[in-house]
Amino acid sequence: MADLEAVLADVSYLMAMEKSKATPAARASKKILLPEPSIRSVMQKYLEDRGEVTFEKIFSQKLGYLLFRDFCLNYLEEAKPLVEFYEEIKKYEKLETEEERVVRSREIFDSYIMKELLACSHPFSKNATEHVQGHLVKKQVPPDLFQPYIEEICQNLRGDVFQKFIESDKFTRFCQWKNVELNIHLTMNDFSVHRIIGRGGFGEVYGCRKADTGKMYAMKCLDKKRIKMKQGETLALNERIMLSLVSTGDCPFIVCMSYAFRTPDNLSFILDLMNGGDLHYHLSQHGVFSEADMRSYAAEIILGLEHMHNRFVVYRDLKPANILLDEHGHVRISDLGLACDFSKKKPHASVGTHGYMAPEVLQKGVAYDSSADWFSLGCMLFKLLRGHSPFRQHKTKDKHEIDRMTLTMAVELPDSFSPELRSLLEGLLQRDVNRRLGCLGRGAQEVKESPFFRSLDWQMVFLQKYPPPLIPPRGEVNAADAFDIGSFDEEDTKGIKLPDSDQELYRNFPLTISERWQQEVAETVFDTINAETDRLEARKKAKNKQLGHEEDYALGKDCIMHGYMSKMGNPFLTQWQRRYFYLFPNRLEWRGEGEAPQSLLTMEEIQSVEETQIKERKCLLLKIRGGKQFVLQCDSDPELVQWKKELRDAYREAQQLVQRVPKMKNKPRSPVVELSKVPLIQRGSANGL
């Protein structure tokens, strides 16, 4: 029966994988719902306050670029050729061979540069033209040949073109997507969890599918009780920090994190799914690798280490078991549990795996940095070639003996190693950090320039264009079955409790890596959801044409901000009422959807603007004179933050203004009133008073 269950789990998992690759959007079991277009009023202020409404910020985001591109290509004729030129350059930069670049560079020059020069309409500098011409004459076609044009294209786009984008519906759509992104609160219900694919000290790893996009991931679940039992709280939190540091920027050689979230019992990392097994497994199945095969793996691992070191992260646990293969056979560095940030303070702890640890790591009290990883790389490459670490002779398992040999033994390299390989390993395995390859001031570049890698084009390595030595078999789960992986004994943690103080440790654990979420959405459901939302909004506009749209009321007035919130202002009401709110310098107005009358609350009536919590949901509490309360609930975190800020600012400024104006005796206070007409307060005045 157990065998049958294992087979069914494998089949289900493999089917999910195949469908996810073909049509991930069709596999989405939940839909992303974009908020109303009116969210723009709140989100634009929220993003502006954080310096996010700039050309550089929006153009560098995947969804921002796609919407800006759509606007330029379809709605702004003068920007269309600039964006087309930009996209052709980006395609050129990804070409694999010099021959392809020679042909394509000439085509780009003729179509986008020479044509404009002949028409006397070339909007770029003479320096940019001469730069490209000079290289083409010499038949030099580096990937960054057109970089001067990239800079000038962006310069031309960041002025009037960007301003027109900000005023367009495409920026409204950007605000809608950013609101969704900034309000992500993941739970287990957001994933379909498949079979177990691995187990570690604190928990287990499963294959899973994200419900709203259909994308497949690995879910690493750490048991909070097991963490507490092993006093591993610092390690668990450190792994989340290290993953957040290395998971930004383009690096296909690290198992990166897209999300982190928590449940009452677990901490979960959502990671890149690697289906090809690890190098330790393949070493045991395949036998030792040739120099050429090892070179292929080494090159990709070096780029992974370079990405970490550029972010001041030292990995500290490089070994074949931590190098995972994807379905195509390319490798990624996994498991950052022992990684450390050395940007402010160098570590000195002796951590890692015996046989791969650098001498400075083994020596107590000695500080180190990325140097440790280059020594470990030398040990690992030796193992791929010989089947054992250079300091683990005769299969000894005595850790003290292995450490002693690491600190004292001069490594003897076999005569069968090529001179280039010997040079590389001798450089990496130097006990003296000041003489070690990778530690002489230029980091990974020193290793990449080793004669052993002379035959490689590092751009081709980065683009994963070289065929890998080993392609994992398709249609198989390259992991042990659930029975062999085993499970934890729940009796171990039966008596362990998790009081509030323990849960508080993980309060800031949840995280979404923005660029990875945007990439996931762009690859799966972006076009579908945009098309559906366009249809819904068009229908709603037609429906609201007679009554007028809620946003129209704010036009031409001194409205600070407007948008939907839910209110609970009447003591006899127990349900939330969704209303459209308008914040003015001296009052807050609201109305129901499709309703003409407004309700009004003046700033003079408000005593304070506070944050409260109702049924574990953050709300805004407006205390009103006479002991009354007015509670508001927002649909998303950014809305709550911005409404709280703007209400407090308006209230404070109104109070300051009142203090400057002489008080009138016996003036009655205005109650909360229903308005069927424009209020007597002059709406078009500078401050409404």
Curated annotation (Swiss-Prot):
Record keyword Kinase present: yes
EC number: 2.7.11.15
Chain positions of site Required for receptor phosphorylation: D3, L4, D10
Annotated GO CC locations: cell projection; cytoplasm; plasma membrane; postsynapse; presynapse
Comment on protein domains: The PH domain binds anionic phospholipids and helps recruiting ADRBK1 from the cytoplasm to plasma membrane close to activated receptors. It mediates binding to G protein beta and gamma subunits, competing with G-alpha subunits and other G-betagamma effectors.
Protein purpose: Specifically phosphorylates the agonist-occupied form of the beta-adrenergic and closely related receptors, probably inducing a desensitization of them. Key regulator of LPAR1 signaling. Competes with RALA for binding to LPAR1 thus affecting the signaling properties of the receptor. Desensitizes LPAR1 and LPAR2 in a phosphorylation-independent manner. Positively regulates ciliary smoothened (SMO)-dependent Hedgehog (Hh) signaling pathway by facilitating the trafficking of SMO into the cilium and the stimulation of SMO activity.
Listed name of the protein: Beta-adrenergic receptor kinase 1
Gene this chain is encoded by: GRK2
